[in-house]
């Protein structure tokens, strides 16, 4: 087993991120000391995955105000709000980003009695707490998910909802790591996940390094492997779950869910409760990020289509709740009716 890749670290008063745009060919860690640097790292996907984005943004708030010139507490709180609003513009779909920023802003607005120095310390403590919580949440998701798995089963996953998308274990991959600890032999199939190939460059990489049996397939092979009986379950992560159970996840997830439904294969969504957005009624209201055309037609520095081609490049799609067998959270497994049962998680 190779050395573990650590996507997020806090060292020497700086945020240290594994540059995931360079994987699997290079392992490079980069330090960030400003909110602007963190914003850019999120936007260009040096760090990606909803939980990891949230943790990084929380540290970004602290970095954005740690050098704030001493003035009044009210001016400092305004600066915290400004930095939070700025970081919120980095990527629009992952609700963990906004959840983490709201927590950081609340630290400032709920502790107006503290001095500026004390508020800075409190902001850093909150960012570290968000970081710690994520690891425990992921393990709990894995433990619940493992009750749906058995030794020897074939599991398909899409994109990367692994340890590289979180702080440890991942969400969709958490049961895979825990199964490995139990001595189980799961056979994982990882869609390469066009256009950025997170399934092949990230999921396959981290599972292989952990000694987990993983096979890479192209996105258009999913139907074939399902028809051959190789897949017993599908498990994916998510960037946002609407109140009715609709799920926004990496582009291509919708198609996988349709195939799973056709072949009567359980389709599971691993979702930390911070990704559940009860304020958004359905998937239709979830904003879908569109990214640059170059990701589709110039992925490897050479055009795979005419340079002038029109390109549509949504980064996410929405899987309707009807296609979802269960949503697996750190608090337990949620099944339909989702509108009613998701609410119970927060009561």
UniProtKB/Swiss-Prot annotation:
The entry marks the following residues as binding substrate, namely 48-50, 91, 198, 249-250
Q: Is Isomerase one of the keywords UniProt gives this record? A: yes
Q: Where is this site: Transition state stabilizer?
A: 159
Q: Which residues form the active site?
A: 239
Pfam families with a match to the protein in the record: IF-2B (PF01008)
- Which GO-annotated molecular functions does the record name? S-methyl-5-thioribose-1-phosphate isomerase activity
Output the GO biological process annotations, alphabetical, semicolon-separated.
L-methionine salvage from methylthioadenosine; pentose catabolic process
Protein keywords: Carbohydrate metabolism, Isomerase
At the top level, the lineage of the source is: Bacteria
Query: Which reaction is catalysed here?
Result: 5-deoxy-alpha-D-ribose 1-phosphate = 5-deoxy-D-ribulose 1-phosphate
- Pathway annotation: Carbohydrate degradation
Enzyme Commission code(s) on record: 5.3.1.-
Q: Which SUPFAM superfamilies does this UniProt record tie to the protein? A: NagB/RpiA/CoA transferase-like
Record-linked HAMAP family: Deoxyribose1P_isomerase, Salvage_MtnA
Which PANTHER family does the entry mention?
METHYLTHIORIBOSE-1-PHOSPHATE ISOMERASE
Function description: Catalyzes the isomerization of 5-deoxy-alpha-D-ribose 1-phosphate to 5-deoxy-D-ribulose 1-phosphate, as part of a 5-deoxyribose salvage pathway that recycles this toxic radical SAM enzyme by-product to mainstream metabolites.
Q: Which family does it belong to?
A: Belongs to the EIF-2B alpha/beta/delta subunits family. DrdI subfamily.
Per its record, how is this protein called by name?
5-deoxyribose 1-phosphate isomerase
**Species this protein is from:** Bacillus anthracis
């Amino acid at each position: 087993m190779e050395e573990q890749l650590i996507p997020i670290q806090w060292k020497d008063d700086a945020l240290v991120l594994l540059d995931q745009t360079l994987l699997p060919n290079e392992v490079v860690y980069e330090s960030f000391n400003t909110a602007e640097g963190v914003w850019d790292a999120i936007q260009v996907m040096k760090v990606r995955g909803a939980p990891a984005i949230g943790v990084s943004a929380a540290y970004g708030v602290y970095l954005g105000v740690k050098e704030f010139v001493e003035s009044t507490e009210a001016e400092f709180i305004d600066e915290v709000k400004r930095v939070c609003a700025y970081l919120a513009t980095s990527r629009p779909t992952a609700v963990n980003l906004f959840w983490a920023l709201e927590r950081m802003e609340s630290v400032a607005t709920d502790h107006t009695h503290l001095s500026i120095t004390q508020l800075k310390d409190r902001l850093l403590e909150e960012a570290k707490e968000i970081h710690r919580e994520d690891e425990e949440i992921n393990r709990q998701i894995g433990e619940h998910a493992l009750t749906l798995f058995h030794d020897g089963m074939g599991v398909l996953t899409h994109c990367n909802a692994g340890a590289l998308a979180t702080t440890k274990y991942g969400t969709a991959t958490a049961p895979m790591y825990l199964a490995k600890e139990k001595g189980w032999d799961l056979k994982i199939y990882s869609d390469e996940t066009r256009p950025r190939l997170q399934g092949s460059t990230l999921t396959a990489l981290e599972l292989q390094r952990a000694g987990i049996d993983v096979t890479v397939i192209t996105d258009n092979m999913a139907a074939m492997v399902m028809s051959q009986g190789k897949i017993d379950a599908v498990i994916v992560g998510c960037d946002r779950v609407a109140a009715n159970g609709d799920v926004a996840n990496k582009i291509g997830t919708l198609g996988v869910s349709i195939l799973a439904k056709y072949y009567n294969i359980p389709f599971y969504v691993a979702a930390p409760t911070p990704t559940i957005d009860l304020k958004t009624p359905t998937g239709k209201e979830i904003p879908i990020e569109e990214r640059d055309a170059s990701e589709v037609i110039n992925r490897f520095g050479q055009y795979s289509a005419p340079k002038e081609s029109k390109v549509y490049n949504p980064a996410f799609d929405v899987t309707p709740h009807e296609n979802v067998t269960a949503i697996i959270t750190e608090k337990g497994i949620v099944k339909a009716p989702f509108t009613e049962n998701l609410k119970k998680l927060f009561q």
